[in-house]
From Swiss-Prot:
It comes from the Bacteria. SUPFAM superfamilies: HAD-like. The keyword Nucleotidyltransferase does not apply. Its EC number is 3.1.3.-. It comes from Mycoplasma pneumoniae (strain ATCC 29342 / M129 / Subtype 1). Phosphate binds at L12, T45, G46, K207, N233. Its cofactor is Mg(2+). The lineage of its organism: Bacteria, Bacillati, Mycoplasmatota, Mycoplasmoidales, Mycoplasmoidaceae. InterPro entries: Cof, HAD-like_sf, HAD-SF_hydro_IIB, HAD_sf. This is Putative phosphatase MPN_383.
Length: 282
């Protein structure tokens, strides 16, 4: 009996996107054909919705997207947030204090903007590269700013809806040390979605939490849904749907929790090859 799948949800970095940070042409063409056949496509990513917009220029999602690891559900069709779970101010204070002590670059994601912070005189290449990928209207609206780290102490977080704080470090060994300090802060969760990054959110937030909010907004059926991902932050959503696919380049934890593992990685049309076989579409 042919599996019933109506909805396809894709992580972005390391999954739908190649290492060149864009979806591959063969995969794009194939997914657009699936959309014509009635499949519903959307994304579930640690990225801010502002940093998803450039991908929507290749593939327009049929459903609202799960952004900030599940903290924000954003509908590009209506340009509005449908659901949001923010970090409490009493949690943000000790997080900010810790980050300033560490003197590492970081980003604050809100429902409207991304605020990046870097050491004065020491540009953070990852921050600069990410900022260069934003598209209109976010460029004109100045929705991604990069500021001196010293300005973070003056950031008025009490007036912002903060969905995620992203630590960026070139020293992978620091992450385990940082998490020990984060364990002492109440009502937060964290996950390392990439080797150089640590995502900090509200304690209830993960991609499965975001999926539940998407279900409530759209009526999406998780039993007719397939999710693709590659990272540790995909584990919860893998376990919340009928079918899950870890990319060939995925983490060990992602592969252990997936229904399937793709034969090819994100740089070799892994999604295209898997779906062509799974759906038996020529």
């Amino acid at each position: 009996m042919k599996p019933k799948v109506q909805n396809l949800i894709f992580d972005l970095d390391g999954t739908l996107l190649s290492w060149g940070h864009e979806p591959l042409p063969q995969t794009v063409t194939f997914l657009k054909e699936l959309q014509k056949q009635g499949f519903k496509i959307t994304f579930a990513t640690g990225r801010s919705h502002i940093l998803i917009r450039n991908t929507t220029q290749f593939i327009q999602p049929d459903l609202p997207v799960i952004s900030s690891n599940g903290a924000l559900i954003y509908d590009f069709a209506r340009e509005k947030a449908l659901h949001m779970t923010q970090l409490a101010p009493q949690s943000v204070v000790p997080i900010m204090r810790l980050l300033l002590q560490l003197e590492e670059s970081f980003c604050i994601y809100t429902d409207k903007k991304v605020f990046g912070f870097e050491k004065p005189g020491i540009p953070c290449k990852r921050l600069r590269t990410t900022q260069s990928k934003i598209v209109e209207p976010d460029i004109t609206q100045n929705n991604f700013t990069i500021n001196p780290l010293t300005d973070a102490s003056k950031f008025d977080f009490a007036t912002q809806n903060i969905t995620k704080i992203l630590l960026i470090t070139e020293d992978r060994g620091r992450i385990s040390k940082i998490t020990k300090h984060l364990d002492a802060i109440e009502n937060i969760s964290y996950v390392s979605s990439m080797t150089f990054a640590l995502d900090i959110m509200h304690k209830d937030v993960n991609k499965a939490y975001g999926l539940k909010a998407l279900e409530q907004q759209t009526g999406l059926d998780p039993q007719m849904t397939m999710v693709f991902g590659d990272g540790d932050n995909d584990v919860e959503i893998f376990n919340a749907v009928k079918y899950s696919v870890a990319m060939a380049n995925g983490s060990d934890l992602a592969k252990q929790n997936a229904t399937f593992i793709s034969e090819f990685d994100n740089d070799h049309d892994g999604i295209y090859h898997f779906l062509q076989c799974f759906l038996k579409i020529e």
